[in-house]
Amino acid sequence: MKKVEAIIRPEKLEIVKKALSDAGYVGMTVSEVKGRGVQGGIVERYRGREYIVDLIPKVKIELVVKEEDVDNVIDIICENARTGNPGDGKIFVIPVERVVRVRTKEEGKEAL
């Protein structure tokens, strides 16, 4: 099993979530996060003054999936989150040693 963590633009959350759900990946955790990549921050103007915003609001989607589903999940996220501009996000794939459903103590793929 693998954990897929995707950091994406907040405005892309609903379309990515729907695309994942439509493909059968309904179990996910979503968190509001802030961060920055190579591009650094952004400069915003407010009442004639410039402000540097160095941590940009993003959304993190986390899913644990079977190893054979990882490439499909990555494709779905990329197809629906991409704008072609810096700041579209990153996807991380992390090994998961064990999954246990708290309610029933089922383990492995059955716990997903």
From Swiss-Prot:
The keyword Cytoplasm applies. Formation of the GlnK1/Amt1 complex is decreased in the presence of Mg-ATP or 2-oxoglutarate. The presence of both effectors abolishes the formation of the complex. One of its GO terms (cellular component) is cytosol. ATP binds at T29, V38, V64, P86, G87, D88, G89, K90, R101, V102, R103. GO terms for biological process: regulation of nitrogen utilization. GO terms for molecular function: ATP binding; enzyme regulator activity. It comes from the Archaea. It is found in: Cytoplasm. 2-oxoglutarate binds at I52, V53, D54. ADP binds at T29, V64, D88, G89, K90, R101, V102, R103. Keywords: ATP-binding, Cytoplasm, Nucleotide-binding. InterPro entries: N-reg_PII, N-reg_PII-like_a/b, N-reg_PII/ATP_PRibTrfase_C, N-reg_PII_CS. Pfam families: P-II (PF00543). Belongs to the P(II) protein family. Homotrimer. Interacts and forms a complex with Amt1. Involved in the regulation of nitrogen metabolism. Regulates the activity of its targets by protein-protein interaction in response to the nitrogen status of the cell. Regulates the activity of the ammonia channel Amt1 via direct interaction. This is Nitrogen regulatory protein GlnK1. It comes from Methanocaldococcus jannaschii (strain ATCC 43067 / DSM 2661 / JAL-1 / JCM 10045 / NBRC 100440) (Methanococcus jannaschii). The lineage of its organism: Archaea, Methanobacteriati, Methanobacteriota, Methanomada group, Methanococci.
